[in-house]
Amino acid sequence: PIQIFETPVQKLGSYDKENHFYMKRDDLLPFSFGGNKVRFAREFVEDMKEKHCDSMIIYGNYHSNLCRILATLCHQLSVPCYMIHNTEDIKDNCETNNSRIIRRMGVREIRCGKQTIAEAVQTAMDELTEKGYRPYYIYGNTRGEGNEHIPMRSYEKTYDELYNWEKENHTFFDYIFLASSTNATQSGLLAGSLKYEDNCKIVGISVSRNEKRGKEVIAGN
């Protein structure tokens, strides 16, 4: 149900006469209100199918864009979906559009704290296995290791779109700025830049991790 197309690059108006600003319009991706996590979700579900799994375990909270998109995708595919909900992550319990959508998608919630995430993932895996399913955890094993490359490759592919756009429009980017949380989008863009050896600077503006931890994650990816 997820159709990925080459999203447009739009020039933005600016009073800055020395620099030109452009935006890659991934908000136009036509699934569950769009955004970069749509590309992640497409890669996760394809990987799930390649591994012959038939149920999905997601991780996050009710404010998460990725959880919203994956919950919607599982609902459309009639795939059982369990959400590992770290209740220590976000204290705010107010209703949002994300939380309303997730709750309506029939997600089975398993609550945990920061120190019990692995146990919660194992509980979800055991429950699904007992029901006869082959569970797929989006982040790999119970420690969240093994699938780092899956969301990354979605934005390595997106870099191909940017590279082709640059050649077609004879306009070449010096910098790419993005909001960076789990660092998967940034890692994928860096992989694309390294592939083409174009020396474009990929600058992540962290919305969660500190600089030291962000660099460690990117280096590990």
Tell me what each language-model feature is.
Residues 1-221:
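PLP-dependent amino-acid enzyme catalytic core
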